[in-house]
Amino acid sequence: PALVEKIQKKAPYFIYGISSSIRFIASQINEKGIAIHKPPHSIIGTSDTLLPAHLKSISSIFKCPVYSRYGSYEMGGGAAQTCPDVSEVMHIIPELVILEVVDDNNIPVSPGKTGRILLTELTNYAMPFIRYDTGDIGIASDGCSCGRSFPTIREILGRDYEQIKTFSGHRIY
């Protein structure tokens, strides 16, 4: 509640924070029926997953666009960000990383398939990470209907250790 009051009072132009914290703040605003008088220009959540449903809900509550940024602490942050036009797709930043979605044998999966995320860093010349296994699970994508030519990933599902693998090999997230 105190943070919600500060947001109302300061009317920030932009909010950047941990996704779960942003979801919590949005839920407090929604539950208490608080109206945002001056919405921020946009919100970016990072550090954990914002699913497309979260993006839409937070956007509705704050009355502004909401984006999810994906990256790795080990590599300095941003690897991909939600498309401003298609919330179900994330654009990879090709100047910074190569992002691959691979199967258990480290073979790239086809679009629409789920796999582990590997990142290759393109900016650290002293000690680069090459095909670094982030421990994250994502869904491969073959592009975005927005028309931008950036490589894409459809969705970040979460951490590999947050899943259950059945005896038949099926994974539950």
PLM ranges: what are they?
Residues 1-173:
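Active-site glycine/GP-rich loop and adjacent strand/helix microenvironment
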